[in-house]
Amino acid sequence: PALYGLIFTVGAGAALAGALSAAKIGARIGQGNTVIAALLLSAVASFGFPIAAMIGDESALPIVIAAGSLIGFSSLVFNITQVSARQALCPEHLLGRMNASIRFFVWGVMPISALLAGAFATWFGLAPVLFVGAIGAVLACWFIFASPLRGMKNIVAEGR
């Protein structure tokens, strides 16, 4: 139990650091590049979990902490940057519908994904399923990397 507390405490600290630095990162490398870099960092960091699962004991703890911290940091940077841009670009009278639609599609697949991942991990083993998930996360980055976001300094100004 103490190790779980350590993992989540360090990850929460990294997430807080991401929240506090999102605006500065966006100002330095541009909001579009921030969204892409944060998403890619999170995807690459997710490879730490299948590696830790393959190790299979407490010696994998630093890998789990590092992966969780990188994902916590980058997830907050990503979410703050993209949600702020979405809300600034969306007409005010459509904000509720836009946010509800995003939440429905993003959060709506999570229970289905968790159920399928659990079933696949039971059938094929934890590490292979985590590797497939990490590969999927990296491949999903291609869509956003190929989008007009790349190079945008200010998503709101350039997106209108």
For the regions a language model picked out, list residue spans one by one.
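C-terminal transmembrane bundle of multi-pass solute transporters/carriers
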Residues: 1-160
